[in-house]
């Protein structure tokens, strides 16, 4: 048994980008709790589980928990509380428990709700680092996000056109993690700014769905999906 519940970061989606330490923790786990969602037609979807299976993790140790996808986070928060209660039962049985998260489990990851609940129960946790999506995106585009003394501003997703314009004017690099949450505001700014490079990504790490472009017109014409990301840098 491990004295800790381990939060394992899976990286952006490409199974080959997971760390050796993370892989070892997965291979030694008695149970792996893995987030999933339900599609509009009722199918259970889990990108995390897909990564685990690609890593040859035994499906029998994977336990899915459904995360409601809604702007009303009350149901999702309740779900995370229930997951923490389930983990508590496994912990009492002295099992090696892993909770997985895409990207890095400490960077805009909802797993912090689970971790906070476990800490309140005096159950110790540890976290294994992973590659966040924006780092993988920069590698795909072969760009440097920030150089020397440049600052980097990371926006979770919601931003107004005025605020985005002001941030661009400061001439710092900007990462917008979930541009679908402010799609119209972002497109309004994109159509009027200059002297910047705009890099747009979808589904980075998922080879058959991966998309990248710098074409402003193409970006504006696209509907931003949930798994999209923007990097804006000065020329």
Model-inferred region functions:
Residues 5, 168-235:
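A contiguous loop/helix-start segment that scaffolds small-molecule binding in enzyme catalytic cores
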Residues 39-42, 132-135, 183, 206-208:
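Short gly/pro/ser/thr-enriched loop/turn and capping motifs at secondary-structure boundaries
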Residues 105-167, 221:
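Class I SAM-dependent methyltransferase SAM-binding "motif I" and its flanking Rossmann-like core
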Residues 76-84, 141-143, 167-171, 211-218:
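Short, surface-exposed amphipathic charged segments that create phosphate/polyanion-binding patches used
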Residues 79-89, 144-156, 217-229:
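A polyampholytic, Gly/Pro-enriched intrinsically disordered region
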Residues 34, 63-66, 127, 153-156, ...:
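Structural signal for conserved beta-strand scaffold positions within catalytic alpha/beta enzyme cores
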